[in-house]
C-alpha cells in the first residue's frame, strides 16, 4: 500500500499546482460591482474576443454601449447577442475601420453629432503578427490599427470626453511592449526587412507611450487614461501566428494553451475594472498587468520619446491639418 503513496502524492501535487497556476494566470473577475447607468461606452473591435466580452460586461452594468467594428455583419450579430444576454436594449453596432483615417473621422463625426456624452472609450481593437500589409493610408498595418488609428480616434473624441467628465480612456496594450522599440527613422518599416513580431511589439509600446503622454495633457480635465495588458487569451487575434491552424501544435501544445491562455471572458475583466472601478476614478497614466498596476518597460517611461512620438503621430494622421475638426491640432497643448 505504501508504495502507492508517493506516486499518488506526486500526482496530487502536480494537479494542485496546475490548478493554482491556472487560477493565477486567469487573474480572476473584476472586483468592482459598480454600475454605469446612463453612461455611454465605445468599445473598438467589439465583434469578437475580448472586445465583445468587454462590451457584454459593460452592458450588464447598464451602459449605453456602442460596438465600433470594421465588419458590420459580425458587429450586428455581436450587438444582438449582447442585447439578448443582458436584456439591455441600449447596445448597437457602428462601423469603424481603424485601417482608414477617413472611416475614423466619419465615425467620430457621427458620435459627436448623435451622442450627448461619451463616458468611457475602450481602445481594444488590434491585429497581431499579420503579413506585411498596409492600411488604406499606407501605414504598416499593426502600427496603423493598434496605435495610430486609436491615437486619431481618441483625439477626435477628446472634447466630448471632457464635456462628459469624469470620463475614462482605456488603451489595450500588451506585455509584448517590453520587447518593443520606437524606430523614429523607420516607423513604417519601409527601409528595413519586415519583422512582424517586432512590428507588433513596437505598436504596443507606442500605446503605452501614448497613454503616458496623454495623461500629462489631460491633467485637470477630469478625463483619465490608462493602459493594460489583458493577458494571453484564446481569441482571433492570434490567427496570423499559425499556432491555431496547425494540427501538430493543437495536439502537442493544447494542454499548454489551456494552462496559460485565458478565456475572452476573463481577459475582459481588466478592461471592465479600469472602466468602472470607483477606486480608480483619479488614477491616470498607469499601466496595468491584468487587475494590478505594474511598471512598464523603461522605454515606455521615457517622456522625451513619448513627446516625440506624439508630435510625429499628429503629423502622420493629419491632426494639424484637420481644420474644423473637434480634434484639430494637438488637442491639448502641453
From Swiss-Prot:
NADP(+) binds at residues 45-51. The keyword Mitochondrion applies. It is a peripheral membrane protein. One of its GO terms (molecular function) is all-trans-retinol dehydrogenase (NADP+) activity. The modification N-acetylserine is found at residue 2. InterPro entries: NAD(P)-bd_dom_sf (IPR036291), Sc_DH/Rdtase_CS (IPR020904), SDR_fam (IPR002347). It is an enzyme of class 1 (oxidoreductase). It holds the Pfam family adh_short. It catalyses: all-trans-retinol + NADP(+) = all-trans-retinal + NADPH + H(+). The active site is at residue 200. Retinol dehydrogenase with a clear preference for NADP. Oxidizes all-trans-retinol, but seems to reduce all-trans-retinal with much higher efficiency. Has no activity towards steroid. This is Retinol dehydrogenase 13. It comes from Mus musculus. The lineage of its organism: Eukaryota, Metazoa, Chordata, Craniata, Vertebrata. The gene is Rdh13.
Amino acid at each position: 500500500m505504501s508504495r502507492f503513496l508517493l506516486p499518488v502524492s506526486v500526482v496530487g501535487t502536480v494537479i494542485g499546482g496546475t490548478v493554482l497556476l491556472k487560477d493565477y494566470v486567469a487573474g480572476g473577475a473584476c472586483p468592482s460591482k459598480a454600475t454605469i447607468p446612463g453612461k455611454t461606452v465605445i468599445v473598438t473591435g467589439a465583434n469578437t474576443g475580448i472586445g465583445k466580452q468587454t462590451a457584454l460586461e459593460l452592458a450588464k452594468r447598464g451602459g449605453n454601449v456602442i460596438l465600433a467594428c470594421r465588419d458590420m455583419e459580425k458587429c450586428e450579430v455581436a450587438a444582438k447577442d449582447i442585447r439578448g444576454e443582458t436584456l439591455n436594449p441600449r447596445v448597437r453596432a457602428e462601423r469603424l475601420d481603424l485601417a482608414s483615417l477617413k472611416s475614423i473621422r466619419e465615425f467620430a463625426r457621427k458620435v459627436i453629432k448623435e451622442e450627448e456624452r461619451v463616458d468611457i472609450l475602450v481602445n481594444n481593437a488590434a491585429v497581431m503578427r499579420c503579413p506585411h500589409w498596409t492600411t488604406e493610408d499606407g501605414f504598416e498595418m499593426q502600427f496603423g490599427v493598434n496605435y495610430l488609428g486609436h491615437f486619431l480616434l481618441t483625439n477626435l473624441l477628446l472634447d466630448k470626453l471632457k464635456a462628459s467628465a469624469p470620463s475614462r480612456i482605456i488603451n489595450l496594450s500588451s506585455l509584448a511592449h517590453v520587447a518593443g522599440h520606437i524606430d523614429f527613422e523607420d516607423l513604417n518599416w519601409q527601409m528595413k526587412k519586415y519583422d512582424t513580431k517586432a512590428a507588433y511589439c513596437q505598436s504596443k509600446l507606442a500605446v503605452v507611450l501614448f497613454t503616458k503622454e496623454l495623461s500629462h495633457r489631460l491633467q485637470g480635465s477630469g478625463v483619465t487614461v490608462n493602459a493594460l495588458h489583458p493577458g494571453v487569451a484564446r481569441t482571433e487575434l492570434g490567427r496570423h501566428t499559425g499556432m491555431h491552424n496547425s494540427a501538430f501544435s493543437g495536439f502537442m501544445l493544447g494542454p499548454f494553451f489551456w494552462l496559460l491562455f485565458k478565456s475572452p471572458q476573463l481577459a475582459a475583466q481588466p478592461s471592465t475594472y479600469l472602466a468602472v472601478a470607483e477606486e480608480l476614478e483619479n488614477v491616470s497614466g498607469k499601466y496595468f498587468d491584468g487587475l494590478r498596476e505594474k511598471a512598464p518597460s523603461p522605454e515606455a517611461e521615457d517622456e522625451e520619446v513619448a513627446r516625440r512620438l506624439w508630435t510625429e503621430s499628429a503629423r502622420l494622421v493629419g491632426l494639424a491639418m484637420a481644420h474644423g475638426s473637434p480634434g484639430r491640432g494637438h488637442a491639448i497643448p502641453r
